[in-house]
Amino acid sequence: MLRFEHAALLRFSERLLAGGGFPGEDSRLVARLLVKADLRGYPGHGVTRIPSYIAWIEDGTINIREKPKIEREGKISAVVDGSHYIGQVVACEGMALAIRKAKEHGAGIVVLRRAGHTGRLADYMEMAAEAGMIGMGSVSVGSGSTTSYGGMERVTGTNPMAFGVPARNGRQIILDFATAAMSMGEIQKRVAREEAIPEGVMLDARGNPTTDFKTFRGPPRGVFLPFGSYKGSGVALVTEILGGILSGNGLGKNWWDKGGHGVNGVFLQAFAVEEFQALDSFYDKVDELISFVKSRKPAPGYQEIFLPGEMARRREAQQLEQGVEIDEATWANLLRLASELDIREVPKPA
């Protein structure tokens, strides 16, 4: 593994994206979110994505010529056509709109269709939490990979769901999880680091359990299992309804053979705590809950009980000090891309 100074990696990522066709402000936004994913320990959503994103611009999967537009709007709701634009930009604008509506009317619900790959839902939940809102979100991923409980053929994508809860002192509770037994990003991280993939995550094309990602990839291709058996399977269908059907994006399966890896249907919601009680009173109770959870005795083999989002913030603080960790394969791909784009200012490992 290599480590890079945060600011240097961020500048390099911006240059790569801009050189690959991303508009200036958007290249900065996407670079910030990708590097943030690496900082927080989610390299599958980090700078490893840059070559794919640029390839998607080249093949038309990402459309940078047409901006997102609001198709339908009410006091607390909006439907946004993402126009296949850069997913992080579409989602940031969508959550910002939901927050504005929540400030004015108590709640905001924005659905996005035809959005590009949106990255980590947690980023948009943090936007809501930092605004003193409770955030909710889900995505219908346009690339089929996950089966239903009892099945062996793909039904949905890894379709994430996420929640954000505001709290004092930067201790927001941020929960972001794939409805597959393991996210594609986590699996890619393990493959890059030659780490084992546990049992109960994948089936091969014949429906047999496998821990070999090469067997999963095929051909013929296998499937991911849902998390928590029938529970995760049910949650995945809800994400498909909210992100796919409600948004007008359509079922994920309709995009499988149309470059679906770059098409997301997204559901975003923010609602104002102050519609229910004073914000300080809410914060007091959340503080009490956090303190109570942290005071519980850890089970054997555990040193501490963590809240959703807490470990990610600790990793971020550590890597800001020690350098951002990037695996050698990802770095080689970025260097190759920099050479193709004639970008000569390249950061050195810390």
Predicted regions and their residues:
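N-terminal glycine-rich anion-binding loops that anchor highly charged ligand groups
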Residues: L2-E5, F22-T48, I62-E73, G260-V263, ...
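Catalytic-core signal marking the mid-to-C-terminal active-site face
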Residues: R3-F12, G19, L246, L251-A350
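Phosphate/diphosphate-binding glycine-rich loops and adjacent basic-rich segments that engage nucleotide
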Residues: S145-T215
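Small-residue-enriched flexible segments
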Residues: S183-G248, G259-H261
